[in-house]
Amino acid sequence: GLLGLGYGGYGGYGGYGGYGHGLALAAAPAAIAAPAVVAAPAIAHAPAVAVAPAVAHAPAAVSTVSQVSYGTTHYAPAVAKVAAIAAPVAVAAPAIAAAPAVGLGYGGYGHGLSLGYGHGLGLGYAAAPALSLGYGGYGHGLGYGGYGYGHH
């Protein structure tokens, strides 16, 4: 994987815009409304295995990425239009778009750095174990490996 620059960073993904390889530039929607009231559990269980497509090739561009930050644990994007290829939608989080964010990462699934407004800073290796420090979205706080403390 090379550098991935896209809309919607995810701690365990390290910049979902890259989608594995190459450089992908995403056009963020003009406005995404985050839910005003969110029921975030004190302990959010991260999926044991993140849904990762077997395809390792990078698409030319990322159109839109809807992502969820659930109780300070950042899950996989729920919907992603990647050129003509759609990312898997079978994720553990509901398909609700969180606050706008910019993801910058090395590689696609598994490891890298994700930095953005609304999701904050995420650093993780493998999909589930990830250190996520974020502000905005569903919750604020610190989460590690799917377990985190957060408030909204």
UniProtKB/Swiss-Prot annotation:
Keywords: Cuticle, Repeat
Bridged cysteine pairs (disulfide): none
GO terms, molecular function: structural constituent of cuticle
Sequence repeats, residue ranges: 27-30, 33-37, 39-42, 86-89, 92-95, 98-101, 127-130
Domain of life the protein comes from: Eukaryota
Role of this protein: Component of the cuticle of migratory locust which contains more than 100 different structural proteins.
Domain characteristics, as noted in the entry: The tetrapeptide (A-A-P-[AV]) repeats found throughout the protein are also present in many proteins constituting the protective envelope of other species.
Protein name: Cuticle protein 64
Annotated organism of origin: Locusta migratoria (Migratory locust)
